[in-house]
């Protein structure tokens, strides 16, 4: 009888059970976080006011340059688990430090920070604030006039060593801390992700289409094109190209909605730039028809 060598046996034998993947080699959570960030960037583009600009991956994940010359830095964080956001969370600490550096220690008065996340607000460990409030909730209370002292103590205990922590430790006046730091930071927590986030984008697209007198019904199909456009712009190596405006959005929507011209899709509504006509001027005849037929018959 014919006997197989050990190597031949190993190569031809079938595994007795499914292959086991290594979870450490998987990055689904990272991909999910990038998708959340880019979707929030797309939503910001659709909600952009007239005269503003959207900057992508410049100071933070995205920034809004306002018509008045201000800059709103937006750090986006997503968690697929049950993690919560506190003032001790690395994402929060890093965003505060970056804001402080970018705003030149708060001296540039028209720079602000938004921390946008799907995470809920959590409580800091080892710290007790008035009313057992969380750090982020108490931050909002300080904006409304609550005592700044407990929040300053919390920040000094949680912030990494650096300029911001040193400045707070120097005991600056409360009104200066409020003006340069507290009043400039917005915490947008528990933001929708997944299908609810997608629904927000679709609704914003539908509103823009209606304003441009384009069919609202195209909004679901355009969502992927908007997302892809954000990815392309975010991938540009030249920072000057990672900028979008409302004019860019309107031009893009007109382009993607009007593919396959002429004719458009069924039920198309007439755009504001179209002009109705009752007749079209045609070029004059070069010769009478009977003359032409006579000449042809004689040839």
Segments predicted by a language model, with ranges:
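Acidic metal-coordinating catalytic centers involved in nucleic-acid phosphodiester chemistry
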Residues: 1-30, 78-299
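Catalytic centers of nucleases
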Residues: 23-26, 30-101
């Amino acid at each position: 009888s014919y006997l197989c060598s050990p190597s031949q046996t190993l190569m031809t034998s079938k595994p007795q059970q499914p292959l086991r993947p290594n979870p450490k080699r998987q990055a689904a959570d990272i991909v999910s976080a990038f998708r959340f960030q880019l979707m929030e960037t797309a939503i910001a583009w659709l909600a952009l006011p007239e005269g503003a600009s959207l900057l992508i991956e410049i100071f933070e994940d995205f920034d809004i340059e306002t018509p008045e010359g201000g800059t709103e830095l937006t750090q986006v964080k997503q968690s697929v688990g049950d993690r919560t956001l506190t003032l001790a969370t690395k994402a929060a600490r890093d965003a505060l430090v970056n804001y402080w550096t970018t705003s030149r220690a708060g001296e540039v008065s028209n720079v602000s920070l938004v921390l946008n996340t799907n995470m809920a607000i959590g409580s800091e460990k080892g710290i007790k604030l008035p009313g057992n409030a969380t750090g982020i909730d108490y931050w909002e209370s300080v904006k409304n006039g609550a005592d700044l002292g407990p929040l300053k103590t919390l920040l000094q205990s949680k912030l990494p060593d650096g300029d911001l922590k040193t400045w707070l430790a120097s005991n600056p006046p409360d009104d200066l801390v409020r003006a340069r730091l507290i009043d400039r930071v917005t915490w947008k927590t528990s933001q929708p992700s997944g299908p609810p986030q997608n629904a927000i984008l679709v609704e914003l697209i539908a509103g823009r289409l209606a304003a441009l007198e384009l069919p609202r019904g195209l909004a679901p199909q355009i969502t992927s094109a908007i997302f892809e456009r954000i990815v392309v712009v975010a991938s540009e190596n030249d920072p000057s190209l990672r900028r979008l405006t409302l004019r860019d959005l309107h031009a893009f929507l007109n382009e993607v909605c009007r593919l396959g011209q002429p004719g458009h899709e069924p039920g198309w509504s007439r755009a504001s730039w179209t002009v109705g006509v009752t007749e079209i001027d045609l070029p004059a005849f070069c010769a009478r028809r009977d003359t032409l037929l006579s000449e042809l018959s004689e040839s």
